[in-house]
Amino acid sequence: MIDFDGYRPNVGIVICNKAGQVLWAKRFGQNSWQFPQGGINEGENIETAMYRELYEEVGLTKKDVRLLWASKYWLKYKLPKRLVRSDGSQPVCIGQKQRWFLLQLLSDENLIDLKTTKSPEFDGWRWVSFWYPVRQVVSFKRDVYRKVMKEFAGVLLNESKKPETVEKPRVERTEKRDFQKRDNQKREFRKSARTWNNSHQKGKAQ
């Protein structure tokens, strides 16, 4: 699907871990690295497209991540002329217009799987520092990456300032009854001890 200006609607995905590093993926059979990204199908909403691409490219599902932020605007880049192809019957795609998503990985990184489809986009991945991709991505994507990471940096900074919430351990009913029973036993013991102590003191006084 290509718009009237020749740009293909696309979603881009930045996945971060708890250390603030981001997932950097190697294109299949090439010495070229980038963030996961992919086209939006006709009639598909942007968020649905993002989760579909997330699974197709890195094998993660919605439950494996937390959505932290979505870019507010479309960001565009043009393809170099050598990459612009046309067979004469289809509209010419001159570049991509993208909406970007920032996700935090919740599940174990071992769930990352680059072979969920017959034609995988990537054949390798690694964690890199937050700003590393801006310097390393191909030149025609660099301006988009710079804008995306600048927007997402503020989001991660705010996330780091939030107090950590510790989930209270769940206590089953049987455990609650055991706790209450032990508390009652302690109270009875203290009561008996006070009674014995009082009577013992009285015996001494006599």
From Swiss-Prot:
Its EC number is 3.6.1.-. One of its GO terms (biological process) is mRNA catabolic process. Residues 162-206 are annotated as: Disordered. Residues 162-191 have a biased composition (Basic and acidic residues). Keywords: Hydrolase. Its cofactor is a divalent metal cation. The keyword Hydrolase applies. Pfam families: NUDIX (PF00293). Gene3D superfamilies: Nucleoside Triphosphate Pyrophosphohydrolase (3.90.79.10). GO terms for molecular function: mRNA 5'-diphosphatase activity. Residues 6-150 form the Nudix hydrolase domain. One of its GO terms (cellular component) is cytoplasm. The keyword Lyase does not apply. A motif (Nudix box) lies at residues 38-59. PANTHER family: M7GPPPN-MRNA HYDROLASE. HAMAP family: Nudix_RppH. Belongs to the Nudix hydrolase family. RppH subfamily. This is RNA pyrophosphohydrolase. It comes from Actinobacillus pleuropneumoniae serotype 3 (strain JL03). The lineage of its organism: Bacteria, Pseudomonadati, Pseudomonadota, Gammaproteobacteria, Pasteurellales. The gene is rppH.
